[in-house]
Amino acid sequence: MSSQDLEQFRIFNKKLETEKDIKPILNAIKSLFDYKPAAEAKITLSNVGISNIVRCLNVQDKSNDDLTCEVLKICFEKFGVGDVVKHFTSHIMYLLRHEKNCVRRLAVDEVYKSVIADVSLLPVPEYIDIFVAVAQMVCDKDVGVANKAIIITSNLQFEAYPKVLEEMKIALEHNSSSKCNAYEVVINISLKSYELFKLSVDNGYIEHMVEELKSNDVLYQLNILELLSRLSVKPYGINYLVKDGALERITALIGDLRNNPLGGLLLPGYIKFFASIAHYYPKEIFEKYPIFLNSLFNAIESGEQTVLPVALDALGFIGITIEGKLCLTAVGSPFIQAIEKIGQLIRNSPAEIKIRALYCYASLISVEKDTPSQGPVDHRVTLMTREWFRSLNKESDAMETLLGICKIPFPDIKLAAYSLLDAVCQHLWGEELVARVAGFVEFLLDRSINEPKEAKEAKYDIIKRLSQSSVFDDNILTRFKTYVKEGPFYSDTTLQVAMEEGN
């Protein structure tokens, strides 16, 4: 900025101390800096400072608070990432604790930009007070401020957390929403390392979460279960929940749901929680916590709409792994009954349940989604999945039933049906069934069917898989390979346009 502009800012700055009507002065400062180059404005602001502007937020007349925020925002935009916090640390501390939402939002945004860009921009020893102040803002009444505080506090350097976690406990004295925000930070950092998890345990957060499951607030309980399920995927997380007895206590809560008038609302959350653990540790969960399996199978058998979608997702998530499939089949008749029930749901349910049931079935049949598995498929799995697929329709032909569902014109149902067909075609027995059912190959190769982009891509992947099969004759294999070569979106119109362009 020119020396004239610098002097003008000094005059405006001085007037903020003496004039009662500060609105025209703030507008003048706003106009002065609005279009000035950042490099010039930064020098002026660094030399003169922003104390008098900030002081405008500390007067009895609050009518100019929004305008003051606008002026400060323009000033802050002239600085690089992290520089505002470095140059005006004490001011940022004041702004973070201000009663006005827009003021706190302005300050937390500056810290957010710094931490997200490079957490090392603000060394912990120098800025620990800033980090503590932000951590306590996870219980801010302004949702935007609270959400930014969660992200910032979840991404600090390790050495900040002993102090931050200690001071963030203030959130546990607030309402359930604030406590959940603090829990979210705790889970976010606990997933990063065992050391941070241990720090969270030592500060009592995890134990507090488990105890809070006794709350009568349904949404609060479900949020806690969701967060604990994220923690349980870590070996140290599940080990703690088991050794501390937390899993036993959570299991007991499932047993109490039948006596709880809100049990129907809570059961989906508990099923989802245990399914997230059983996905990784099916054998241990099935053996030690049979009440979970009973609740899962009962939910599927009952057909209760409030819990059925989650139960179908949960069973599919458990059964997507090879170990999950083997553990489920070891359960015996309760699982077989569940499979048969899912077959009925696929055939006779409204669209939403039909789709969930199809995806559940696809997960149970598929053997390629279990990434850790290597080598040939276990022969037991081949036999099991073939038998499970027959349960799609025991009174008729299961593959003909699937063909009929694939022909349903609704895009979401068609896509789910293709997902199941793809899972079936991962097996030799599945390829043989496709070859055996009259009209199935012709249906797959028929490009005249009006299908959305996702369905065309899904069908293309199935045909690509079948083009490598040994169960079809040479003529069909040639047609499959031609289809693959032409791509998922080829049509006679495409050929006609290409020929016209060639001519």
Regions found by a protein language model. Give the residues of each.
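N-terminal "cap/leader" segments of large eukaryotic alpha-helical scaffolds
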Residues: 1-58, 165, 491-503
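Hydrophobic residues within the alpha-helices of tandem HEAT/HEAT-like
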Residues: 29-36, 68-77, 110-118, 152-158, ...
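Eukaryotic tandem repeat interaction scaffolds
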Residues: 246, 252-413
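Short, hydrophobic/charged alpha-helical patches characteristic of ARM/HEAT alpha-solenoid repeats
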Residues: 3-4, 39-48, 79-87, 120-128, ...
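Alpha-solenoid helical repeat scaffolds
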Residues: 70-71, 79-81, 109-110, 152-153, ...
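HEAT/HEAT-like alpha-solenoid repeats
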Residues: 10-18, 50-58, 62, 89-97, ...
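Solenoidal tandem-repeat scaffolds enriched in leucines and small polar residues
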Residues: 101, 111-294, 304, 311, ...
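Residue-level detector of extended alpha-helical repeat arrays and alpha-solenoid scaffolds
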Residues: 22-25, 65, 104-105, 146, ...
